[in-house]
């Protein structure tokens, strides 16, 4: 039965030329399959490689078979022997020595033995190097060293396979689009086709070492094309950290980027890693036999375990160290600083490192606000007749203001390290004291806010706890501007306002003050006789006087004509009543009214904020935010914003009690809540972002970045200032100097969709800038445009189409990051709502120029006469001069100061008038008037569905409101934020691969690329930088290609004028270089889009960008038939010939010429161009003068040229090439000698006068010398292939000579 099956199988099996019988498939390669074969003559097993002839031309096939016949002469224990070749109609069969154990790549598979230990890798690599030494001595470059081409026997002998022929097969394949070799093991010069040499095999050896140690070669986690990109781009492939120093050094030698610096195979055999491991291996073999492998693996795993433990301990120690450092940096002395002290942060950072005890001082500032409330009350409200704390001239006395002096001293002391340490000790001593010292500090800070108070007013309310003096409470406040107290009545209900002065007449007020003074004097007398006096007594005292007068508190109106002496005690009582009304059980109107009155009171008496926060805190107010009533929520948010405004301590307090996530819940899109609430929430978050790094960190920790992303609304015209807030907030986040990498912030923002929003914002800002610029360049200047608006108020009327909801709290200065800190939390949010503002001729300097101009126009258009036109023009002239204002403390130093800024700084105080002098109900009245305008339209009417500005000035599609806004919109502000957005995109483009992958969506890239021809050069440069950064990541290249990046980039090379033209060309060429490198499809696409003329211009003009243009131009010869045709039509061959004089580019240029000729079409236009006398002379002269270090590399391109064109071959031979070839036969390099002999043979076969060639050059004698030298051959290592070629050529010459 068995005999019958065997016989049957024999008859069914294929046989080759009746000599070999094909068996099972044992391998599969790029150019065919490998079968086991049986030699029918002697019974030897062989390996038979079967290659399809489908894409191989007959001429190339003959060359390949000749190469195999030549390689049959090689014989070495560490190479697979070629036994011959057989050709059928469809296939070429290459007969090879059979190596039974297969390849190392198969052995290290996870399901077999897995990765090898270093000791075993040394055994195999040493044999690989010995095989390479032999091949290189014979003039053969392997070109494809890898685990799959290293075969092993059962005795552990290693043999190199698949050398020499793979190269010929690749070159012969007319449909190939790749370079020779397997991507992950290829050397950079092989990928770039800049000259393959023996050193290319050394690079592949290094990759094979990593493959045997880890089971995969370098970059195996990437696709082949990105891997090729990284091989060329990176300085060196990544080397595993766990390797020994010797093997690491071995790999660094293999991975030298410059092939000339790599050692040869013979040198590497003497490397310490190979030498030491060989000795250890011999000892191991003698003592332990085959068990050595298992023990080595165990010891290796133990070492790995110990290493992991050490690493874990190290990481743990680092974390502990970082936690200490972070705690000190976050909670240390820095938290006691005032705003002035930010400049000395570095010095305080040094003092933190000097003392770890500073950690205990963290708790002082925050806790001191809450504790010891009675002390704070007494410091604010108690009475004392001797005024210990403050003398009449405003000078502090030693005992009363010792703490203030110490605080000021600490501020000054922070400028030096030594004094900073003393300050740290003082702070540490105070950290456990929750008494009046910390409270006084917060109080003094609050009192300093109104800068209009006189010098002695600064310390008026900063008495120490023991001082119960109230003289300053009733001292005439003549230095307070008249408008300061007016706004308290702005929020009074209309019913109360109508009552006028009825509750308390002027005389009654004076009587009240007299009674109160008398009662105070009586209490002072009692105090001198030993009775105690505190804030509670003061309150009861005031209530008693008020009860005597039976005053209607609810109907109380603070008349602006009233004497300030009489208002203060009444406000104190009103304050207590209003605070008590902030309960969820109260009615909606009562809560809203109380909040509005408290806001007005806090504006006039900021020190009351300290009382409120200390006595009540934020928790009662937070309870009100749970109310479902939107009016209550909005009013409470306004109150919170007024309290925390410009006070870092209060902001930190609000953060610590959990206000951030609560307020964030109101910052979402308007479909979830009213726009007013969202604006108030935005103002709160803006304060946190711009005040201090601590509040910013808390904001980020509460997932604040997604909230900022949400503020980047698509409708820029409608949400202008909210968009500005988001942009500035993101920059604040990026500039935060903490241990968290900026890349993490980029990833969070990108994950939440910021990139598409940024690009839409970039588009909208660019359109706004263009519209603003057009408005400026119109026939009317800003003065005339404004006055025409004032004269014709109808211009503000809008066409029908919907309106805005009324607002009682708008901010024109909200989110203005480049201005002074907003003075009010209830100014207009953006320019589209400025029309709702009440009339103010005196405009605050912290508003944008746009807002100032517009408000004057709106005032006139809404019935408020401008009685003094001369007031308008000076303001406008100042606005013309006013530069973008600087950042406040804690903000980014982003805006570049324009020339002449300091010269105009004196203008700002002229505009810095009080903006809150008008009653708040003017805002309400104004809002109603705007709503009464028929068909009032939103500015968003000019926006497309994507939120992009589409209108132009004067167009019928734009609303009147937006047209007016755009007319007066400051182009500087829009262009400034346009630049910021472009810089933000650049930050994301510089991030890691994950962030870049978010940026590489098709729609996003397409939108970005379509902006190339719409933006000004500075913004265009930034966008091009983004594209260039993306192109450096191999994972982004496919996405860029799909988005037609090449098509959009190339037109930018046509820019010829401007200061930035060189930088623009640099970014474009660099991006194109990254995109087109290695990839022939992209090279062809670039050629189709007209890149070749630009490249030739850069090359011929000797531009600095030649370094990018030259490789691209040379790659075009390899790209496609179309690209080669374009090259020829634009004179590319002449450029290549001129590059032969360039030592660095000559080899690449010659190879490009050879490729163009090899792929020449039937018209033979390339051949005709090369047959010109100048071209022939250039080629011959180049061969003669080529530097020695490049000589080996130019022989293969010359061989391609003369074998592809017999006419060029003959012309070169008769014009001086033949003597040069024969003269260089004494070259000692075997690779050079072998190629020279091939060149001489090709020239001889096509020479018109072969006998003359033989006689004139004494060719037989030169060949005989080579053969005899080879026979002696000790010092040249026996170059077998050279000998074989010389012998074959000599026989051919002998035949010709005989004939």
Swiss-Prot record:
EC number: 2.7.11.1
SMART domains reported in the protein's UniProt record: S_TKc
Top-level EC class: transferase
CDD domains associated with the record: STKc_Cdc7_like
Highest taxon above the source species: Eukaryota
Main location: cytoplasm
Pfam family, one: Pkinase
Expression induction: Expression is cell cycle-regulated, with higher expression in G2-M phases.
Catalytic reactions on record: L-seryl-[protein] + ATP = O-phospho-L-seryl-[protein] + ADP + H(+); L-threonyl-[protein] + ATP = O-phospho-L-threonyl-[protein] + ADP + H(+)
Stretches with biased composition (Low complexity): 374-385
Modification note: Autophosphorylated.
GO CC field: cytoplasm; microtubule organizing center; nucleolus; plasma membrane
Polar residues bias locations: 415-432, 488-501
Subcellular localization: Cytoplasm, Cytoskeleton, Microtubule organizing center; Nucleus, Nucleolus; Cell membrane
Coiled-coil residues: none
Disordered: annotated segments: 291-458, 483-509, 795-852
Gene3D superfamilies associated with the record: Leucine-rich Repeat Variant (1.25.10.10), Transferase(Phosphotransferase) domain 1 (1.10.510.10)
MF GO annotations: ATP binding; protein serine kinase activity; protein serine/threonine kinase activity
Active site: 144
Tissue: Expressed in both the sporophytic and the gametophytic tissues, especially in dividing cells.
UniProt: ATP binding residues: 26-34, 49
Function: Serine/threonine-protein kinase involved in the spatial and temporal control system organizing cortical activities in mitotic and postmitotic cells. Required for the normal functioning of the plasma membrane in developing pollen. Involved in the regulation of cell expansion and embryo development.
Protein name: MAP3K epsilon protein kinase 1
């Amino acid at each position: 039965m068995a005999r019958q099956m065997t016989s049957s199988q024999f008859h069914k099996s294929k046989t080759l030329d009746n000599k070999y019988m094909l068996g099972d498939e044992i391998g599969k390669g790029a150019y065919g399959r490998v079968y086991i074969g049986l030699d029918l003559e002697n019974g030897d097993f062989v390996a038979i490689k079967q290659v399809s002839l489908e894409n191989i031309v007959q001429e190339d096939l003959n060359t390949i078979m000749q190469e195999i016949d030549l390689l049959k002469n090689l014989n070495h224990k560490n190479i697979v022997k070629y036994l011959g070749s057989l050709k059928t109609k469809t296939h070429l069969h290459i007969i090879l020595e059979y190596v039974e154990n297969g390849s190392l790549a198969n052995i290290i598979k996870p399901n077999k033995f897995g990765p090898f230990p270093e000791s075993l890798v040394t055994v195999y690599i040493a044999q690989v190097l010995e095989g390479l030494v032999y091949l290189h001595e014979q003039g053969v470059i392997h070109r494809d060293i890898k685990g799959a081409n290293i075969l092993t026997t059962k005795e552990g002998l290693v043999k190199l396979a698949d050398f020499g022929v793979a190269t010929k097969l690749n070159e012969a394949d007319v449909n190939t689009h790749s370079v020779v070799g397997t991507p992950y093991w290829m050397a950079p010069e092989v990928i770039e086709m800049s000259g393959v040499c023996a050193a290319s095999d050394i690079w592949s050896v290094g990759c094979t070492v990593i493959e045997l140690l880890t089971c995969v070669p370098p970059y195996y986690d990437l696709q082949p094309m990105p891997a090729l990109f990284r091989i060329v781009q990176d300085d060196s492939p990544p080397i595993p950290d766990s390797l020994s120093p010797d093997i690491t050094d071995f790999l660094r030698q293999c991975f030298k980027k410059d092939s000339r610096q790599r050692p040869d195979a013979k040198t590497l055999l003497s490397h310490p890693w190979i030498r030491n491991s060989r000795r250890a291996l011999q000892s191991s073999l003698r003592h332990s036999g085959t068990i050595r492998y298992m023990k080595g693996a165990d010891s290796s795993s133990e070492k790995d375990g110990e290493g992991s433990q050490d690493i874990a301990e190290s990481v743990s120690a680092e974390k502990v160290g970082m936690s200490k450092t972070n705690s000190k940096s976050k909670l240390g002395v820095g938290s006691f600083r005032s705003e002035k002290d930010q400049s000395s942060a570095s010095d305080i950072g040094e003092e933190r490192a000097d003392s770890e005890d500073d950690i205990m001082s963290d708790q002082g500032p925050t806790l001191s606000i809450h504790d010891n409330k009675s002390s704070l009350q007494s410091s604010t409200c108690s009475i004392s007749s001797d005024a210990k704390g403050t003398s009449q001239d405003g000078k502090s006395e030693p005992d009363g203001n010792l703490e203030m002096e110490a605080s000021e001293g600490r501020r000054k002391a922070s400028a030096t390290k030594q004094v900073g340490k003393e300050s740290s000790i003082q702070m540490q001593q105070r950290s456990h004291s929750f008494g009046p010292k910390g409270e006084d500090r917060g109080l003094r800070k609050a009192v300093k806010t109104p800068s209009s108070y006189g010098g002695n007013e600064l310390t008026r309310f900063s008495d120490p706890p023991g001082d119960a003096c109230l003289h300053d409470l009733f001292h005439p406040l003549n230095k307070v501007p008249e408008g300061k107290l007016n706004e308290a009545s702005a929020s009074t209900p209309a019913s109360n306002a109508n009552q006028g002065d009825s509750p308390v007449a002027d005389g009654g007020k004076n009587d009240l003050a007299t009674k109160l003074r008398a009662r105070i004097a009586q209490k002072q007398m009692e105090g001198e006789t030993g009775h105690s006096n505190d804030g509670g007594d003061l309150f009861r005292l005031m209530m008693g006087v008020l009860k005597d007068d039976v005053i209607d508190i609810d109907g109380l109106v603070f008349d602006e004509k009233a004497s300030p002496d009489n208002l203060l005690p009444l406000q104190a009582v009103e304050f207590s009543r209003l605070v008590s009304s902030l309960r969820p059980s109260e009615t909606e109107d009562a809560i809203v009214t109380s909040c509005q009155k408290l806001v007005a009171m806090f504006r006039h008496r900021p020190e009351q904020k300290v009382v409120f926060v200390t006595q009540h805190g934020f928790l009662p107010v937070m309870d009100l935010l749970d109310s479902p009533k939107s009016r209550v929520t909005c009013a409470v948010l306004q109150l919170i914003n007024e309290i925390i405004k410009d006070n870092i301590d209060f902001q930190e307090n609000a953060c610590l009690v959990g206000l951030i996530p609560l307020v964030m819940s109101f910052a979402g899109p308007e479909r979830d809540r009213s726009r007013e609430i969202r604006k108030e929430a935005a103002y709160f978050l803006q304060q946190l972002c711009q005040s201090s790094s601590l509040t910013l960190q808390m904001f980020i920790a509460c997932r604040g970045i997604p909230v900022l992303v949400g503020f980047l609304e698509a409708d820029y015209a409608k949400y202008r200032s909210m968009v500005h807030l988001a942009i500035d907030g993101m920059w604040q986040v990026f500039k935060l100097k903490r241990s968290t990498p900026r890349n993490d912030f980029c990833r969070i923002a990108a994950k939440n969709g910021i990139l598409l929003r940024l690009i839409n914002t970039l588009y909208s800002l660019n359109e706004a800038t263009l519209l603003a610029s057009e408005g400026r360049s119109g026939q009317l200047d800003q003065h005339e445009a404004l006055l025409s608006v004032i004269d014709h108020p109808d211009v503000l009327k809008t066409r029908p189409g919907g309106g805005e909801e009324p607002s009682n709290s708008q901010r024109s200065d909200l989110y203005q990051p480049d201005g002074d800190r907003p003075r009010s939390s209830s100014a207009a949010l953006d320019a589209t709502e400025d029309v709702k503002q009440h009339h103010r001729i005196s405009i605050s300097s912290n508003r944008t120029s746009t807002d100032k101009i517009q408000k004057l126009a709106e005032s006139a258009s809404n019935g408020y006469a401008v009685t003094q036109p001369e007031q308008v023009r000076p303001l406008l002239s100042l606005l013309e001069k006013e530069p973008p204002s600087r950042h406040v403390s804690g903000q980014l130093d982003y805006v570049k100061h324009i020339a002449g800024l300091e010269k105009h700084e004196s203008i700002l105080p002229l505009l810095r008038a009080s903006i809150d002098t008008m009653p708040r109900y003017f805002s309400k009245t104004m809002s109603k008037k705007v709503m009464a305008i028929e068909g009032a339209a939103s500015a968003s009417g000019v926006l497309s569905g994507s939120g992009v500005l589409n209108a132009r000035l004067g167009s019928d599609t734009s609303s009147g409101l937006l047209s007016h806004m755009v007319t007066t919109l400051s182009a500087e502000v829009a262009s400034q934020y346009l630049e910021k957005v472009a810089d933000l995109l650049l930050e994301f483009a510089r991030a890691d691969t994950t962030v870049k992958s978010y940026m590489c969506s098709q729609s996003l890239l397409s939108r970005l690329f379509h902006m190339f021809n719409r933006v000004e050069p500075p913004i265009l440069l930034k966008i091009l930088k983004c594209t260039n950064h993306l192109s450096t990541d191999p994972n982004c290249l496919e996405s860029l290609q799909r988005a037609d990046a090449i098509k959009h980039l190339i037109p930018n090379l046509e820019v010829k004028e401007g200061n930035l033209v060189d930088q623009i060309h640099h970014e474009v060429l660099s991006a194109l270089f990254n995109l087109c490198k290695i990839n022939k499809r992209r090279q062809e696409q670039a050629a189709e889009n007209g890149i070749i003329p630009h490249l030739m211009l850069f090359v011929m003009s000797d531009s600095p960008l030649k370094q990018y243009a030259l490789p691209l131009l040379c790659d075009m010869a390899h790209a496609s038939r179309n690209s080669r045709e374009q090259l020829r039509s634009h004179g590319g061959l002449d450029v290549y010939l001129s590059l032969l004089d360039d030592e660095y580019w000559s080899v690449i240029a010659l190879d490009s010429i050879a490729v163009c000729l090899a792929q020449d079409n039937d018209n033979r236009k390339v051949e005709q161009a090369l047959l010109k006398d100048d071209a022939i002379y250039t080629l011959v002269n180049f061969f003669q003068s080529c530097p020695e270090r490049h000589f080996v590399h130019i022989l293969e391109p010359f061989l391609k040229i003369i074998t592809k064109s017999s006419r060029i071959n003959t012309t070169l031979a008769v014009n001086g090439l033949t003597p040069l070839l024969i003269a260089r036969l004494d070259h000692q390099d075997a690779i050079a000698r072998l190629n020279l002999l091939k060149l001489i043979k090709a020239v001889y076969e096509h020479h018109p006068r072969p006998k003359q060639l033989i006689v004139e050059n004494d060719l037989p004698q030169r060949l005989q010398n080579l053969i005899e030298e080879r026979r002696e051959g000790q010092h040249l290592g026996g170059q077998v292939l050279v000998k074989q070629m010389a012998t074959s050529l000599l026989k051919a010459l002998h035949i010709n000579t005989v004939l």
